[in-house]
């Protein structure tokens, strides 16, 4: 057999084996986890009381394409129920239209975001969700997914962390481009996480049940 013939056979064998080797190397690579989270260290939580915000909130619900600009406080410093009711309406479930009274602490945090980022409009990605899965803070009207145009979500995430004196959850969603902020049940530790999954990634449809357990309190009705 000539040297040229041998060289051609060797080259052919290398070309055939190359794709197989590449496929094996790809299989060996570990898949990157979409989610990572941990309890927040107590040493990282806020130790000083939060100053009272201005009360101003400019909020737009992305799915509903509605927005409001209100002050959650009356001139005497008490809560303005009519303003809270307008925000409750904006926080309503986009799928069912159900409305619940959202935790006022969440609205105070919204006002702090408004104050910190120079009065920019806050976009609400998700508020109250009328779902059967009652482990979600959205179900209990104590969570929100937000973003602000022109502000990086990392900056929003860091600011949200600075507001946590205990009992808050703060999540970063780089793929979807928003942060999650919630208030936890009494005694629950603060939690931090990053979720790289995109919209509707891995979500399963939940069957609706005819019987439902206790839910969050009814929505507030405007008083003025």
Placement of each model-derived feature along the sequence:
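Short, surface-exposed glycine/acidic/tryptophan-bearing loops
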Residues: 81, 125-143
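Structured segments of extracytoplasmic/periplasmic soluble domains
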Residues: 60-62, 90, 109-120, 149, ...
């Amino acid at each position: 057999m000539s040297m040229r013939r041998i060289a051609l056979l060797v080259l052919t064998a290398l070309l055939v084996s190359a794709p197989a080797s590449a496929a094996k190397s790809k299989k060996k690579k570990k898949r990157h986890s979409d989610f990572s989270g941990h309890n927040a260290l107590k040493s990282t939580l806020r130790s000083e009381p939060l100053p009272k915000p201005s009360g101003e909130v400019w909020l737009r619900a992305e799915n509903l394409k509605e927005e409001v600009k209100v002050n959650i406080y009356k001139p005497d410093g008490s809560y303005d129920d009519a303003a809270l009711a307008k925000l409750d309406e904006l926080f309503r479930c986009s799928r069912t239209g159900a409305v619940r009274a959202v935790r006022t602490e969440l609205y105070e945090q919204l006002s702090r975001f408004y104050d910190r980022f120079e009065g920019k409009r806050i976009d609400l990605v998700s508020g109250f969700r009328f779902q059967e899965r009652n482990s979600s803070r959205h179900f209990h009207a104590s969570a929100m997914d937000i973003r602000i145009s022109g502000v990086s979500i990392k900056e929003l995430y860091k600011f949200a962390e600075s507001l946590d004196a205990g009992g808050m959850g703060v999540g970063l969603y780089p793929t979807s481009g928003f942060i999650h902020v919630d208030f936890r049940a009494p005694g629950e530790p603060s939690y931090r996480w990053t979720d790289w999954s995109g919209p509707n990634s891995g979500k399963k449809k939940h069957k609706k049940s005819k019987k439902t357990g206790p839910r969050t309190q009814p929505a507030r009705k405007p008083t003025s």
